[in-house]
């Protein structure tokens, strides 16, 4: 399975602190995928000589095919190479200036691994940029969503899922309804480049996901909570991560301006296919045994052959942004 990771930077933080963690997470995420890698840099901390964040630019029609594209509010870089070959020091200045960033390391389950259009982050629809770890039933998603999903450019289930989410932009409960329609394994992160002050992170069935904060108030997420412990050990405890496993069926809306914080939580019913838990053993790559056992003990997903509980999406916590 793929690896996802990201950060939202505290405004008063030394930019290199969170940037170093982000790059280190990318290297650790190679444990979960080496077929392709990429990252998106979101917003701007407005360095000296600049006023405010860049405005969103319309995504070019071929954005999903490009190895690098500047969308104004978001810059996307990706390649069909592992993270260690993709990342270069020339990206450090832009990363230090970004308010948020998220990355992806691909272990291909659907779609040609050697084709750039299938590498993430994916730029889709009217301006959604996202990454996905998992394997979902794309045909069922197209069939079950009444509003329909536009045609895909590539061959991945991730693109279909992100196109479905693009249709619910700006509607938190509507987004949870889309996630509840998903059948299969999923953990993902995305932004609406027209409203980059919020980053969305969600966990569906099975695929692990954790969020963490460090001693300077930076907020992170990653496929494995184990990675945060490794990095803290390497730093001699200086990073001081506080780590939380994200439960199945949870969408988090994270403020990417001001002080990073989870502004809203929305729950939905996660659904897996029969056998998903043993068909994809790589979902636990990079996760130590203690964390695997904890995730498994907390599992709450429904198997597709069983009846839905009928509760629908539920906004369980909300706070004003800004």
Predicted regions and their residues:
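Conserved short alpha-helical segments that host acidic/polar catalytic motifs at enzyme active sites
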Residues: 1-322
């Amino acid at each position: 399975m793929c690896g996802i990771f990201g950060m939202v930077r505290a405004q008063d933080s030394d930019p290199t602190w969170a940037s170093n963690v982000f790059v280190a997470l990318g290297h650790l995420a190679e444990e979960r995928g080496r077929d392709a890698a990429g990252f998106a840099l979101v917003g701007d901390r407005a360095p000296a000589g600049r006023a405010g964040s860049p405005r969103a630019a319309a995504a070019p029609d071929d954005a999903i095919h490009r190895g690098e594209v500047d969308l104004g509010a978001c810059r996307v870089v990706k390649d069909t190479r592992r993270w260690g070959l993709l990342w270069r020091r020339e990206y450090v200045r832009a990363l230090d200036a970004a308010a948020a960033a998220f990355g992806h390391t691909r272990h291909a389950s659907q779609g040609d691994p050697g084709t750039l259009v299938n590498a993430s982050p994916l730029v889709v629809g009217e301006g959604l940029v996202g990454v996905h770890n998992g394997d979902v039933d794309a045909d069922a998603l197209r069939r079950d969503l009444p509003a329909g999903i536009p045609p895909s450019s590539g061959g991945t289930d991730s693109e279909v899922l992100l196109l479905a989410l693009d249709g619910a932009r700006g509607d938190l409960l509507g987004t949870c309804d889309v996630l509840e329609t998903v059948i299969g394994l999923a953990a993902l992160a995305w932004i609406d480049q027209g409203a980059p002050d919020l980053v969305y992170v969600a966990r569906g069935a099975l695929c692990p996901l954790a969020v963490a904060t460090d001693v300077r108030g930076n907020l992170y997420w990653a496929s494995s909570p184990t990675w945060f412990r490794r990095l803290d050990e390497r730093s001699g405890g200086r990073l001081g991560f506080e780590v939380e496993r994200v439960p199945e069926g949870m969408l988090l809306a994270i403020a990417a301006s001001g002080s990073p914080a989870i502004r809203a939580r929305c729950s939905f019913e996660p659904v897996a296919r029969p056998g998903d838990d043993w068909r994809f053993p790589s979902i636990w790559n990079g996760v130590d045994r203690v964390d695997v056992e904890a995730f498994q003990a907390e599992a709450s997903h429904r198997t597709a052959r069983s009846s839905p509980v009928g509760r629908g999406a539920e906004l369980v916590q909300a706070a004003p942004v800004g």
